[in-house]
Amino acid sequence: MNGLKREHESSSSQDGSKTPETEYDSHVDSIEDIHSLASKRKKLNEKKENLEDLTLLKTSAFELKLNELIREISVRGKYFRHANTFVEKIKDLIFKTPVIPETNFWSACKNLEKDKKVIVPLAEPLSAKDTNLRASFVPPKTVTPGIFSCSNKFFLNPDGWSYDLFLEIPESIFTQKDYLNGRYFRKRAFYLTCIAKHLLENLGNEVKLEFVAFNDDIRRPILAILPESKGFAATGKRFTVFLIPTVRQIFPVSKLLPHKNAIRDFMEHEELKPTPFYNNSVLEEQNLLFYRDLVKKYSVNPQFLDACGLGSTWLNMRGFSSSIHSNGFGLLEWYVLMALLMSSTGLPAGNVLNTYLTAAQFFKSMLQFLSSKNLTSTLFKLNADSSNLKIGNGHLPTLIDCNTGFNLLGKMKQSFFEYFQASCRHTLNLLDENANYNFSKIFITHVNVPALEFDVSGCIPLEPKELEDPNFCRKTDLDSPYSLYLEYTWDLLQHALGDRVCQIILYSSICTSCSINESLKTKLPKLISFGLLLNPDALLRLVDIGPSPDDTVGSQKFREFWGEVSELRKFKNGSIAESVYWECSSPDERIRIPQRIIRHILNRHLGNNVGDRVSFRNEKFRVYVHSKISPNTDTYNEYVPVMEAYNEAVKSLINLSDIPLSIAEILPADESLRYSSSSVPFYESSTCAPIDVVFQFESSSKWPDELEGIQRTKIAFLLKIAELLEALDNVERASVGLENTDNPTHNCCFLQVLFSNNFTFRYRLRNDREIFFWKSLERNPSTKLSAQKGLYAYEHMFQFIPRHTLAIQAICQAHRSYSMAVRLAKHWFYSHLLTDHVTDEVIELLVASVYINSSSWRTTSSGETSFCRMLHFLAHWDWRFDPLIINSNGKLPHDVRHQATEKLESIRKQDVAIAHNAYYIITDYDFDGNHIGYYKPSKIIANRITSLARASLSELLKDTPNYKSIFKSSLDIYHVVIDVNINKLPMYRESNLTKYKNLQNMSSERPGFEPITEFVKELHRCFEDTISFFYNKKNPKVVTGVFNPRILANRPYRTNIDYPFKVVDKDTVVLDADVVCEEIRQVGGDLIRSIQLQLKA
């Protein structure tokens, strides 16, 4: 039950079991069917109010999905009826619990525990045992449904579902002063234990009884009753009854306001400090019945309850709960706040909820209120005009109901509240952008997954001795040493990291519970989890500057906080200040400064080498990435030499003066110039693949009037330019190369220039007159097909690729981590042998979608996290019906998704087999999606990518993932495995150049020549309809193949069979795979070491 027994942090999704995410996914498609019914609805009553008519007629797909979601998370009536019988039995037993006359509290506890069946769950600190504390037991005045149960509508959560019962303790049990020094909580614990013991004696093995810390506050135990009978197991949903002791308002509210002190036993000789957390806990206890009655009043409105169901799902998906070790705002607060906003007086305009709102409007209004700036900057009061309660400004956040004095945000830390508000605002943005399309991002996707949510995440393991602080009660009004340790650690890290992080979250996802014969205080969590959202603007700062020496107090505090790493430094402007300098020998060390700060500060202030024990979740992933991709985390800087060489290449060309036409434009057209190549030129190898550049002359009417003539003129221009470039001091060699020699109307030449900096650039000349001639040929039926191919090739090479390069450059410059993310993504695609089956441009846009498009998470500053999010997108993207839209510069029309969806529907109707556009991707520079994903990937490869992404994501989300397996593809699924003789490949030969000086002059005379790529192209040409080939161009040790399924089966002999076959019987033949392998060997020659045929009979 949200707020009582908190969900565990994505544990079910990590161990492979079914999660709400996978469970909900199965219903989304069915909602789409419902959408078609909405258009068929007719007006039932022409005389209805306009608002009602509009609501009926404009029932959106989003609202239909909400209705379906509510239906899915609601507990069915048959389950409730079965559970209600059990609850009535519990209530009868509670009222029959034996009376215990008033006696000394400690004697009563000892007597209750003497048979060792139960232990009274008392929290520290305990008052001196000679105090005259009295205890007694009489049955509760009432046993009634709690806040979640009073409406008889129950919602599922990750732990199943629950029924909360409020036990109203008679006022005679307490005195007017029992709110002081924890007396109320001790009597409450004794009272609950009496009931627990009676239930144990009467129910025996029928139930499992546990004490659970209410909201993880061990001062406030509640009793969890879990039925063990087969009848409940048959329901398929875990069911729990929670018994929650409560009282009516018996303590004066004025004594329990945030600025008051209510813990005095241990502060007798000290200044009495305010105890806001303790006071708020007491106020919550004595107002639960009041808030239950308020919620029950508004529960007659089904839209109110549905909005609570939506709130429950939204909170669960983000890991928000009422736990003081987590967020501090859960479903209980959601129910109460909704009821208060409907009933409170004196609220500013726009904050009042009206009864005529729909569930969706209730939900959105709640998020708008919770994200309000008023809650962060001021003391927000409800019912202030009807109360004389004087409430002073205390710690924020504060949202106080003046009728009760209860602060609804009292369990939240300010920084957690800021994070909570950011989540509210992010959800509102998703709703405003496209509520229907973003439905799954809001309600279905598990957001609280550290590998997907944070830039840096990990845990701090604690030893038992670190939670044994007998004096913790002198330092805080919190419930336990763990809560104090968590808060102190949070304050330390927040102060130490400062503006290097946008957000820091510390939490525990472990529910504090124990058997009724154990003590809750021995079951405190032994782990603190944390997550950081980094600030890219301050992340790489080397020096943290403190106060000047003139500020003696500030300087002393700075040195005490930082310890031996602090020092006085003089800066270039002449100023002197206390500072901390983080020495870094590489960009990777610089980006890891936050991790170094965490370890240092925890070691210094917590001792016991706590900092050294910190485990960063992505540490091993980062190590693996560095070994495969780059030793640097910020790979953006690795491209600085490439961009400098490009600028030199541009200047060298544009400064030429002896060419007939002046150059109008030079554009980058290569993955190396968009910071996204799988390997940086010259960074990992001694050679450089040619870097493509496109340039264009100013317009001229003297160009030939036919395509072949234009190509010959291009050759003449490039020969002249090559001659001029070779005369420059910074050019080693310039030559004109030919391509497309079998098709003279296509671009057939390029200029390849080797500069003295060893970078090779390949220039291609663009002439837009070619488009006119291609379109003219397209109008002729006899040349239409070839003209369409020629036009596509021209537009792709000279228009799309340069525009794509500029767009990706802009993304990478705005998000420096994009470079690492896209290189990781390419490594993943290549590792699974998908080279040439998915184009680099498609991969780059898949990663760009993580940064450009809205998602369940805010934009990350970590390449590794972005890669994980890309896998999440691929694992859940239904590319059959959902277009991918990349609006990189914001120029696409606002209804682009509607247009793209309609276009995709039309494409799928015309191409049912999905021969083209398996991935339908729209960008602002390719609005029709003709150049991205039109040919590649194919439908089969797209399905393969989805399967690989799901498997990889599942592995990544495990507690101890095997990162190597994510980038390793099994060879068992392939029919043919060709073992490549890697000694024949330049990329492996060149690794020896740095080892042997006599080989350093043997660098390749053909920059960029890749024998394995040419080999695979030749295989595709020879066996196009017989076998599909797969390889990894970054590490081509094997080439694999899969036979076309249609030729594997026996088939009747035909004279037009175009593949090797052997006779099975008189008129039946089958593929002769051995002959195919022999033909492959002949094509590969020395490149092939061996061929393994894995075709099963």
Curated annotation (Swiss-Prot):
Gene3D superfamilies: 1.10.1410.10, 3.30.70.3030
Subcellular compartments: Nucleus, Nucleolus
Main location: nucleus
Keywords, ordered alphabetically: Nucleus, Ribonucleoprotein, Ribosome biogenesis, RNA-binding, rRNA processing
GO molecular function (one): snoRNA binding
Sequence segments annotated as region (Disordered): 1-27
Domain of life the protein comes from: Eukaryota
GO cellular component: CURI complex; nucleolus; nucleus; small-subunit processome; UTP-C complex
Any one GO BP annotation for this protein: rRNA processing
Compositionally skewed regions (Basic and acidic residues) per UniProt: 1-10, 18-27
InterPro entries: NOL6/Upt22, Nrap_D1, Nrap_D2, Nrap_D3, Nrap_D4, Nrap_D5, Nrap_D6
Family designation: Belongs to the NRAP family.
Function in brief: Involved in nucleolar processing of pre-18S ribosomal RNA and ribosome assembly.
Subunit-level organization: Component of the ribosomal small subunit (SSU) processome.
Name of this protein: U3 small nucleolar RNA-associated protein 22
Organism listed in the record: Schizosaccharomyces pombe (strain 972 / ATCC 24843)
